[in-house]
A protein has these predicted regions:
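Hydrophobic/aromatic beta-strand elements that line small-molecule binding cavities or substrate pockets
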Residues: 24, 62, 184-187
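Extended charged/polar low-complexity repeat regions
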Residues: 92-94, 109-611
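Intrinsically disordered, low-complexity segments enriched in small residues
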Residues: 30-83
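Short, conserved DNA-binding cores of transcription-related domains
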Residues: 63-68, 72-78, 93, 97-101, ...
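Intrinsically disordered, low-complexity proline/glycine-rich segments
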Residues: 1-49, 221, 311, 315-323, ...
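A generic local secondary-structure boundary/capping motif
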Residues: 14-17, 62-63, 291-292
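Short alpha-helical segments and helix-capping/turn motifs at coil-helix boundaries
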Residues: 56-61, 97-99, 105-109
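Short, polar loop/linker segments at the starts of domains and inter-domain junctions
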Residues: 83-97
Length: 611
């Protein structure tokens, strides 16, 4: 009764036949892939707070996103929730996670995947080549060690896009949330061996994100330092288009030294300010442990674009994003590529990483209060609604400053906690029902009308939706869990077809009209031709960064597009010399549009970004 699968897809029966039906994670005595909590960005109120966790959350704020296949998207997610089995503090400080802060803990009793929402997802140990599926998270966790997967394994095709050394290594783990990819490669950072080390060191008891591979074999690579003060941390990224980024990191000691130099300069200047901050203590080290995990003090200071294949001789003279931190290593401020501060944060002096206030550029500050257990009890917004949160057994009461009250009733624990009844401010009640994996199977609205969702036993995909009137819409899927048909209550049917790479090649409407899609590039998901039901064809041409360069309609007229290095559209050229030109300020805001005759529209913005 060790929690290993009783019967998995691809296993052999006594008769020598393969098991091709059933879940990949049917366990004896233990669940698999269950998270310690619900997703922080799931149900939120106010600005925002997750009432099921009692946590202040910021589900995701993007600081950098240049276009391209497998782009490097740098985002930050915050949650004041603290898991009992945390990964180390990430590069944005306690409470924050970057996409590359994903970590896998390898323990004797199991595997713990720490996601970029600050949660812990628990899996049973995996044998080499084994794949486990979390029904509640719709996530696969795999271990390398085999050249190919059995043909009955839904991930067998996606497995083959991985580099051979990754597939064959039993020390590499992989995760994905889609049969079309991408794969997240969880390996360990290389390090320079010590002078007294004769043999290569054993892999550590954890894995970190070292790369991403999509269904076309394109890669996003995270380069980690092999030695020095920031050993093991991400110092560079190469995206799927070949761009290279440098991540400038600092240690707590380096930030403390910089602070002391700045303070000395300020105090020695006759006109220098004499503020309370001049005497602020900035320690050289941080406490080794926090409620958010162990902390090595390494922080991301700035991100630079160091190489762009489309602009090999031009590089930005300023970072694309910049960050500053408090003396306690907490993220204080975020600056965009123009050097403008766009975000600011304040934390509880007694609880490292507990956010008590934040604001956007030009906006008022939202403040938060917590109870003794670390749950948010109040949000105060000087120019909006305030909210109070009261926590009871299996219920949460949310009241705003207009005295409107909602009550959430919950069932389940941890990652399977769900809201099963909601009392709205107007007195109405809605209800929801879930299966044992936490997947929605029925909803009843305030008028008592019930909608039911039929789910596939293994995948959880919705196979039918039955409305309050008893009419049913049915959905069909292929082996890659892509929708292939929709059958409506009147008997009419629409359908979709895909190629071996999962790209849409044809879709037929309820009326029987078919639209077809063609692809010139076998390593791209972008269509180059669209043929409608009349036989008319449209053609598209794309840049290496996935931007539309030219569109030719069914009449043969072509529209061409131009972009700057940041992916912003700067010109549109239509037939007969009709062109439009756009320009942007350093913050990336549209400030001018001009036509071929010189007529111009100009735009201005407030500090908050309002037009």
């Amino acid at each position: 009764m060790g929690g290993k699968p009783a019967a998995r897809q691809g296993d052999m029966t006594r008769k020598g036949l393969d098991i091709v039906q059933g879940s990949a994670g049917v366990l004896i005595g233990a669940p698999t892939g269950v998270a310690c909590s619900v997703c922080p960005g799931g149900i939120t109120y106010a600005n925002p707070v997750n009432p099921l966790l009692g946590a202040k959350v910021l589900p995701g704020e993007t600081d950098l996103a240049l276009p391209g296949p497998l782009p490097f998207i740098l985002s930050r997610a915050y949650s004041s929730y603290r898991t009992r089995t945390p990964a180390p503090v990430g590069v944005f400080g306690p409470g924050w996670k970057a996409p590359f802060d994903i970590r896998l803990q390898i323990r004797d009793e199991g595997l713990i995947l720490n996601d970029n929402g600050g949660r812990s997802i628990h899996f049973e140990p995996l044998f080499p080549g084994e794949i486990s599926y979390s029904r509640s998270e719709s996530l696969w966790l795999a271990r390398g060690g085999v050249a190919e997967q059995h043909s009955s394994q839904p991930l067998s095709a996606l497995w083959q896009v991985l580099p051979e050394d990754v597939r064959l290594s039993p020390h590499v783990y992989l995760a994905t949330n889609s049969l079309q990819g991408p794969w997240w490669i969880l390996s360990w950072p290389e390090r320079v061996p010590g002078a007294d080390e004769v043999l290569p060191p054993e892999p550590p008891a954890y894995r970190v994100l070292t790369g991403v591979v999509d269904g076309f074999g394109r890669t996003l690579t995270f380069h980690r330092a092999a030695e020095g003060d920031v050993a093991g941390a991400v110092t560079g990224v190469t995206d799927g288009a070949g761009r290279r980024f440098h991540l400038a990191l600092t240690t707590q000691a380096q930030r403390a030294e910089a602070f002391r130099k700045q303070r000395a300069t300020s105090l020695s200047s006759p006109a220098g300010p004499r503020s309370a901050s001049s005497s602020l203590v900035f320690p050289d080290t941080l406490p080794a442990g926090t409620g958010y995990g162990t902390d090595n003090g390494i922080r991301l200071e700035a991100v630079w674009l160091t190489h762009d294949p489309a602009y090999p001789d031009e590089q930005p003279t300023a970072p694309l994003a910049r960050y500053t931190y408090t003396a306690g290593g907490e993220l204080r401020a975020v600056y965009d590529r123009s050097g403008t501060q766009v975000r600011g944060f304040t934390y509880d002096a007694e609880h490292a990483g507990r956010m008590v206030a934040h604001h956007y550029a030009g906006r008022p500050e939202s403040c938060y209060r917590y109870d003794d257990t670390g749950r948010v009890t109040e949000q105060v917004n000087p120019e909006g609604l305030d909210y109070r949160f009261e926590y009871g057994e299996s219920r949460v009461i949310i009241t705003d400053s207009l005295n409107r009250r909602e009550v959430l009733y919950t069932e389940g624990e941890g990652g399977l906690k769900r809201v099963v009844k909601k009392e709205h401010a107007d007195g109405s009640i809605t209800r929801s029902e879930y299966d044992e994996a936490g997947r929605l199977k029925a909803q009843t609205d305030a008028a008592g009308r019930r909608t039911e969702y039929s789910l596939h036993m293994a995948s959880g995909a919705v196979t039918a939706v039955t409305g309050p009137d008893g009419r049913t819409v049915r959905y069909g899927y292929n082996s890659q869990r892509q929708v292939t048909s929709v059958t409506y209550p009147d008997g009419l049917r629409s359908s979709r077809e895909y190629d071996e790479k999962g790209r849409l090649t044809a879709e037929t409407s309820r009326s029987g009209e078919t639209t077809r899609y063609s692809y010139d590039d076998p390593a791209s998901e972008l269509p180059t031709g669209i043929q409608d039901a009349t036989g008319s064809t449209k053609q598209m041409a794309w840049s290496r960064y996935g931007q539309l360069l030219a569109f030719t309609d069914c009449s043969g007229y072509t529209t061409r597009y131009e972009y700057d290095r940041y992916g912003q559209q700067i010109a549109v050229h239509r037939e007969e010399g009709i062109s439009t030109y756009s320009s942007y300020n350093p913050r990336g805001q549209l400030v001018s549009q001009k036509d071929a005759q010189g007529r111009e529209i100009r735009y201005e913005y407030s500090a908050a970004g309002d037009l």
